[in-house]
């Protein structure tokens, strides 16, 4: 099983809040039959399952602490192993957030095939998030919070991008355009993997 993961197509999807990476991931799943894994979703699902790991996570998150990397990787690996036979590949969404996370992923799971960098400018991301805030009711979609989230994102992501860029596996997508324009760039990169 572990060997199958080493051979699987694994794509790290990195993009700021409001870059549209979630939408692009959905479209990739529909067209290419990849499995979309978001560490945030996995954590939330584990917590609501009420498992012993879920209870431990819940108490960590309630204190506002970061979930240990070890735990996140175990969950990712479990989720990938469960799907490795039925999936055409994996989209790992919002991971790695720092270089160490990427290195540990490779040590414990496998090497990424590509890092898809969904890149939109700060103005675009802010506008999209404010618009989403009008309809989503998400508390973190107001201008002040957005500014902080973008700063955090840039600080964390730049080293990750340059780490994988040195290996030549970063594919930058200009995410300023419409959903379909952006997706056609994504397809160019994914089609080249077949």
Curated annotation (Swiss-Prot):
Start and end residues of each stretch annotated as NMP: 38-67
Location within or outside the cell: Cytoplasm
PROSITE patterns, per the entry: ADENYLATE_KINASE
Record's catalysed reaction(s): a ribonucleoside 5'-phosphate + ATP = a ribonucleoside 5'-diphosphate + ADP; AMP + ATP = 2 ADP; dAMP + ATP = dADP + ADP; dATP + AMP = dADP + ADP
MF annotations from Gene Ontology: adenylate kinase activity; ATP binding; deoxyadenylate kinase activity; nucleoside diphosphate kinase activity
Residue list for modification Phosphoserine: 38
NCBIfam families: aden_kin_iso1, PRK14527.1
Full protein name: Adenylate kinase isoenzyme 1
């Amino acid at each position: 099983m572990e060997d199958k993961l080493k051979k699987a197509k694994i794509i790290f999807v990195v993009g700021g809040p409001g870059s549209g990476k979630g939408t692009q991931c959905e479209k990739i799943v529909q067209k290419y039959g990849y499995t979309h894994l978001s560490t945030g979703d996995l954590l939330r699902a584990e917590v609501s399952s009420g498992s012993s790991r879920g209870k431990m996570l819940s108490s960590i998150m309630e204190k506002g602490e970061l979930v240990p990397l070890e735990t996140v990787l175990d969950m990712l690996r479990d989720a990938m192993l469960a799907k490795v036979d039925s999936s055409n590949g994996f989209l790992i969404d919002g991971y790695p957030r720092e270089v160490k996370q990427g290195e540990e992923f490779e040590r414990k799971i496998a090497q990424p095939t590509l890092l898809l960098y969904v890149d939109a400018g700060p103005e675009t991301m802010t506008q999209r998030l404010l618009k989403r805030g009008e309809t989503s009711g998400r508390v973190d979609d107001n201008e002040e919070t957005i500014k902080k989230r973008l700063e955090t994102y840039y600080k964390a992501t730049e080293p990750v991008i340059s780490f994988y860029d040195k290996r030549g596996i970063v594919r930058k997508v200009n995410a300023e355009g419409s959903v379909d324009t952006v997706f056609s760039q994504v397809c160019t990169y994914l089609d080249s993997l077949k």
